[in-house]
């Protein structure tokens, strides 16, 4: 393998000849052979948006020549097209400020930009620190790239998947408004409910999560850029942060702004904690929904079996013909992982000692993982399970007709205690509710038929 010699303030080091990174990236590769979790490419794209905006801002402020600005923008655009992904090899488990990933981007951008200048016959050279990282510090660039990446992934991946599943439940909700089934509380029989009403609860959970997500992602639009090392903005023009935010906004279509307090932006990640809290809320709702669906689909002959769900693959290596609710199991595992990630994000975000939080990569890694798991999980759950939910009306009607909790409709007519006696007698003696009610002497057959109407119980108003 061919190599070339690169150098940094520690001296010279060999770098693979076909790779565009430089000395600091190579040192990080050697110093941190930890785990297999690569720094997410999405944050590299966030960095590319930032470096692009920084070049335009520095140029506008008279700190960067036309040629250097054009070369840096060219290199960043190549990164954003996904053409340079192989040149970003670093793992999550590195310095807590993300300095090495910032330098990885600086080095690749400078390498590509210098090639561009040479091809254009321009006698200038671009330095990773002095030009690509001009007016910046890893301490304000990494959190900026974090926010750019997180906002984009919520906008383009999570929200569409959430809406997709929500729309499916809305369709099922409307379709099954005429099917009346027994409700359940405490895992015990309760008063009747429409299947459409039950599904409406699931749909509304996703509506609320959509609202919470829209609110929490607003705070991710605030960028740390301009704070440089400790929030004072040393070595940066006072307008640098505002200009970079403007250029990033123009290129992404999102309304990013420069944070009004850079000291906060470097040492606190409460905006991400809030965002991940919303992800946890969504995970909790998805856990509940998936559990409800697999319980309602349990069976086929010794479970509830009120609904059927698609049969996607064999469920057992030993029991022939067995089919399992695998999509529900997948989604509940996703929910558990997201809840665990929330703990990590919360603890990591509490570690902002003095002027800098140095747990940034793990905060980013866990939050992005949660976004991807939830987005992919909802999409596949929708396509392979939710769209195929169908009622098993024979079982639904049998449970409804056998339920003792229909007795609740007698409360206004004979009182709670007499109604309770009727239900207990029916259960103890194996009677139908109607038989027990008539035997009690408190209710005639005609009154029972008039008062016990499940269709009235699901729409009492």
Curated annotation (Swiss-Prot):
Catalytic activity: (S)-malate = fumarate + H2O
One term under GO cellular component: cytoplasm
Signal peptide positions (record): none
Subcellular location: Cytoplasm
Gene3D superfamilies: Fumarase/aspartase (C-terminal domain), Fumarase/aspartase (Central domain), Fumarase/aspartase (N-terminal domain)
EC number from the UniProt entry: 4.2.1.2
A biological process term (GO) from this entry: fumarate metabolic process
Active-site residues, Swiss-Prot/TrEMBL: 186 (proton donor/acceptor), 316
Site (Important for catalytic activity): 329
Biological role: Involved in the TCA cycle. Catalyzes the stereospecific interconversion of fumarate to L-malate.
Note: There are 2 substrate-binding sites: the catalytic A site, and the non-catalytic B site that may play a role in the transfer of substrate or product between the active site and the solvent. Alternatively, the B site may bind allosteric effectors.
Protein name as it appears in the record: Fumarate hydratase class II
Species this protein is from: Staphylococcus haemolyticus (strain JCSC1435)
Organism classification: Bacteria, Bacillati, Bacillota, Bacilli, Bacillales
